[in-house]
């Protein structure tokens, strides 16, 4: 079951909370919620910049533990600084990082920003983290599976080497969803206290000829 911002029921399993209001990211603190997804619209300047990055053959990979207060977000991807929309992109990454830090009272975060031309994690899984922010800036978004329609015994080695579609993990194919581009996703992991058995089940999407690359931002609790 998926709930909207207008309708929230506490079930015996975890739910996804869907909204278009950034303030609703705080719903991730609800014990019954393991995914919080906020859809948003971005301006054309930002989307054109992202489109250029995805068309460029050179890969992008930025992985660093940063202190939010001192990190220079306008130093991200300096080789693209001449492109229209660069500052809008940097401001957006900074804004998402600020939201994440404020929500969880963090001073440091692990920031990852990279282009992908393959499914990095092609099988459904649960991350061994407290809570991860995921935003696909361009390309196909991360897929997630509703908790009520997952047989968690089939995760990992429980799949017997079979694909998600054949292992019995997915109890209803209609319960598999894709995060829209630019949506802000919060995924509770297995390290969230009290949520150890209900971490958000998700996977990388299969890419297509029409959309062969994606630009992914993730934020994690810093050390």
Label every PLM stretch briefly.
Residues 36-39, 108-114, 135, 186-187, ...:
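A structural signal for short, well-ordered beta-strand segments and their strand-loop junctions
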Residues 46-47, 144-146, 188, 195-196:
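Short helix/loop capping segments that flank catalytic or ligand/cofactor-binding pockets
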Residues 1-80, 87-91:
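N-terminal auxiliary "cap/dimerization" subdomain that precedes the catalytic jelly-roll/cupin core
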Residues 118-181:
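Catalytic core of non-heme Fe(II) oxygenases with the double-stranded beta-helix
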Residues 113-115, 137-151, 201-204, 216-223:
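Active-site environment of non-heme Fe oxygenases that use a 2-His-1-carboxylate facial triad
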Residues 168-223:
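Catalytic core of Fe(II)/2-oxoglutarate
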Residues 78-126:
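Extracellular-facing segments of soluble proteins and assemblies that are Gly/Ser/Thr-biased and enriched
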Residues 32-35, 130-133, 182, 213-214:
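Short, surface-exposed beta-edge/turn micro-motifs
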């Amino acid at each position: 079951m998926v709930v909207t911002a207008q309708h929230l029921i506490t079930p015996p399993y975890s739910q996804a909370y869907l909204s278009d209001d950034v303030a609703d990211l705080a719903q991730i603190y609800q014990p019954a919620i393991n995914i919080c997804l906020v859809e948003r619209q971005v301006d054309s300047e930002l989307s054109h910049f992202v489109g250029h990055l995805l068309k460029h053959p050179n890969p992008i990979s930025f992985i660093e533990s940063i202190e939010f207060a001192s990190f220079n977000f306008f130093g991200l991807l300096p080789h693209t600084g001449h492109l229209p929309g660069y500052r809008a992109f940097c401001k957006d990454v900074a804004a998402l990082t600020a939201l994440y830090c404020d929500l969880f009272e963090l001073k440091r975060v692990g920031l990852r920003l990279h282009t992908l031309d393959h499914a990095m994690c092609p099988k459904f899984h649960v991350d061994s983290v407290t809570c991860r922010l995921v935003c696909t800036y361009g390309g196909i978004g991360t897929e997630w599976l509703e908790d009520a329609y997952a047989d968690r015994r089939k995760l990992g080695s429980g799949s017997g080497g079979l694909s998600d579609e054949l292992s019995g993990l997915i109890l209803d194919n209609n319960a598999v969803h894709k995060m829209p581009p630019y949506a802000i996703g919060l995924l509770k992991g297995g390290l969230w206290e009290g949520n150890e058995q209900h971490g958000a089940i998700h996977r990388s999407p299969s890419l297509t000829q029409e959309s062969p690359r994606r630009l992914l931002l993730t934020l994690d609790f810093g050390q």
